[in-house]
From Swiss-Prot:
Residues 119-304 form the GMPS ATP-PPase domain. This is Putative GMP synthase [glutamine-hydrolyzing]. Gene3D superfamilies: 3.30.300.10, 3.40.50.880, HUPs. It is an enzyme of class 6 (ligase). Pathway: Purine metabolism; GMP biosynthesis; GMP from XMP (L-Gln route): step 1/1. Coiled coil: none annotated. Keywords: ATP-binding, Glutamine amidotransferase, GMP biosynthesis, Ligase, Nucleotide-binding, Purine biosynthesis. The gene is guaA. Homodimer. Pfam families: GATase, GMP_synt_C.
Length: 429
C-alpha cells in the first residue's frame, strides 16, 4: 500500500505564504481528493516526476513587484497541468503572462462581488451573472489582463477579481474560495476545479491508511520492546505532530510568515539520539479524529478541547511565575465547570482562561484593593485555522465571573475575548 506522501491522483498547492493555505488544503481533502502543500520554489522536474492532476497557487503577503517577492518558474505553466491561482497567485499569473499589477484600494473581509458565466462558475452561475458575497484580503490589483484571458468576476473596487484562459486551463481568483464559512459558493468553485477541470477522482479517505498505520505502529512497538528487553536505554521519541502544525510553523522553503511556532515542529536538535516517530504528521485534525473513531477510541478522548503542548505557560501573558500558574489553573477549572454545568462544553470547539499580569482597582468589603485580570476565551471552529468567538449566554458568563472573583482573592476583574480568527489567533501566544 502506498503511503499518503506518494498518493496518486494528487492536487499540489504551491505555498506563497498565505495563512489560508492550511484551510485550502483541508477543503480540497474534504472533496475526497488527496492534496499536498509544497514550497513555491519546487522544481519543474519534481512536478514532472510526481505528475499532479492540478496545481493551486496560494495567496501570500508579498507584492509581485517587490524585488524579493517569490516567483513561479515559468516552465511550470508549460506542463499543461490545470492551475488555479488565488489572490497573490492570480496577480503572479497575470504578470507572468503580460498583464499588469498595481497598488490599489484594499479589500478585506466580506465583499459583494459580481460573478460572470464561465467554466469555473458553471455550477453557480447559469446564463446570467450572479451577485454574491466572498472573502477578500488584498491591496494590490490586476489592472490589465494578459492576452488570451477573460474577466470572470469584479467588485466595486476591483474590476478584475477573476480571470480565466480556458484554452490553457488557467484560472485566477482575487478572492479566497477556501474560506467556506464566509464564501458560500467557495466549495462549489473548488469542487468544479478539482473534480471536473482536473478530473481528479474522489478516492481519498484517511481511513484508507488505517491498516498501514496500525501495521507500522505494531512493528514499532515490537522493535521498541525488543530493544528495551536488551537494554534500559531509551531509544524512541513519539510525537503527535499533525499536518496543520507543519504548515502553520512555516517550514524551510515556504514563503509563509510564521504565525505559530509549534513546539513539535523543527524544535529538535539534529544530533538527537532518539528515533522520531510521527505517524500522524500528514493528517489534519479532523482526519485524525476519523481514524480515532475507526480504532475504537472513546469520544471522551476524541472530543476533548485542544490543549497546547507547552501547557498553561503560553496562557500566562508575560513573565511566568508559579503563583500566576496557580491562579490560572483555578480560573480555568471554574470556567470549564460552568460550561459543563450549562451543557455548553461539547457545543463549542475550544474554551480556556488566560492570566493577564495587569492589576486594576476594585472594591472588596468596602476596601480599596488591586487584583489581577482573567480573560476567558471560547471559540467555534471546524478547522481551527479560522473561527468565531462563541456567543455564550450572559448568565453563564456572569456565573463564571462571579465565581472566579469570589473564589480567587487575587483576581479583581474578568473579561471575555470577542475576537474572531482572523485577525486574532485562538491562543494569545
Amino acid at each position: 500500500m502506498q503511503s499518503a506522501r506518494r498518493h496518486l491522483n494528487t492536487i499540489f498547492i504551491l505555498d506563497f505564504g498565505s495563512q489560508y493555505t492550511y484551510v485550502l488544503a483541508k477543503q480540497v481533502r474534504k472533496l475526497f481528493v488527496y492534496c499536498e502543500v509544497l514550497p513555491w520554489n519546487i522544481s519543474v522536474q519534481c512536478l514532472k516526476e510526481r505528475a499532479p492532476l492540478g496545481i493551486i497557487l496560494s495567496g501570500g503577503p508579498h507584492s509581485v513587484y517587490e524585488n524579493k517577492a517569490p516567483h513561479l518558474d515559468p516552465e511550470i505553466y508549460k506542463l499543461g497541468i490545470p492551475i488555479l491561482a488565488i489572490c497573490y497567485g492570480m496577480q503572479l499569473m497575470a504578470r507572468d503572462f503580460g498583464g499588469t499589477v498595481s497598488p490599489g484600494v484594499g479589500e478585506f473581509g466580506y465583499t459583494p462581488i459580481h460573478l460572470y458565466p464561465c467554466e469555473l462558475f458553471k455550477h453557480i452561475v447559469d446564463c446570467e451573472s450572479l451577485d454574491t458575497e466572498i472573502r477578500m484580503s488584498h491591496r494590490d490589483h490586476v489592472t490589465t489582463i494578459p492576452e488570451g484571458f477573460n474577466v470572470i468576476a469584479s467588485t466595486s473596487q476591483c474590476s478584475i477579481s477573476g480571470i480565466e484562459n480556458t484554452k490553457q486551463r488557467l484560472y485566477g481568483l482575487q478572492f479566497h474560495p477556501e474560506v467556506s464559512d464566509s464564501t458560500p459558493t467557495g466549495n462549489k468553485i473548488l469542487e468544479t476545479f478539482v473534480q471536473e477541470i482536473c478530473s481528479a477522482p474522489t478516492l481519498w479517505n484517511p481511513l484508507y491508511i488505517q491498516q498501514d498505520l496500525v501495521s507500522k505502529i505494531q512493528d514499532t512497538v515490537i522493535e521498541v520492546f525488543d530493544e528495551v528487553a536488551q537494554s534500559l536505554d531509551v531509544q524512541w521519541l513519539a510525537q503527535g505532530t499533525i499536518y496543520s502544525d507543519v504548515i502553520e510553523s512555516s517550514r524551510s522553503g515556504h514563503a509563509s510568515e510564521v504565525i505559530k511556532s509549534h513546539h513539535n515542529v523543527g524544535g529538535l536538535p539534529k544530533n538527537l539520539k532518539l528515533k522520531l516517530v510521527e505517524p500522524l504528521r500528514y493528517l489534519f485534525k479532523d482526519e485524525v479524529r476519523i481514524l480515532g473513531e475507526a480504532l475504537g477510541l472513546s469520544s471522551y478522548l476524541l472530543d476533548r478541547h485542544p490543549f497546547p503542548g507547552p501547557g498553561l505557560t503560553i496562557r500566562v501573558i508575560g513573565e511566568i511565575l508559579p503563583e500566576y500558574l496557580a491562579i490560572l489553573r483555578r480560573a480555568d477549572l471554574i470556567f470549564i465547570e460552568e460550561l459543563r454545568k450549562a451543557k455548553l462544553y461539547d457545543k463549542i470547539s475550544q474554551a480556556f482562561a488566560l492570566f493577564l499580569p495587569i492589576k486594576s482597582v476594585s472594591v472588596k468589603g468596602d476596601c480599596r484593593s488591586y487584583g489581577y485580570t482573567i480573560a476567558l476565551r471560547a471559540v467555534e471552529s471546524t478547522d481551527f485555522m479560522t473561527g468565531r468567538w462563541a456567543y455564550l449566554p450572559c448568565d453563564v458568563l456572569s456565573s463564571c465571573s462571579s465565581r472566579i472573583i469570589n473564589e480567587i482573592p487575587e483576581v479583581s476583574r474578568v473579561v471575555y475575548d470577542i475576537s474572531d480568527k482572523p485577525p486574532a489567533t485562538i491562543e494569545w501566544e
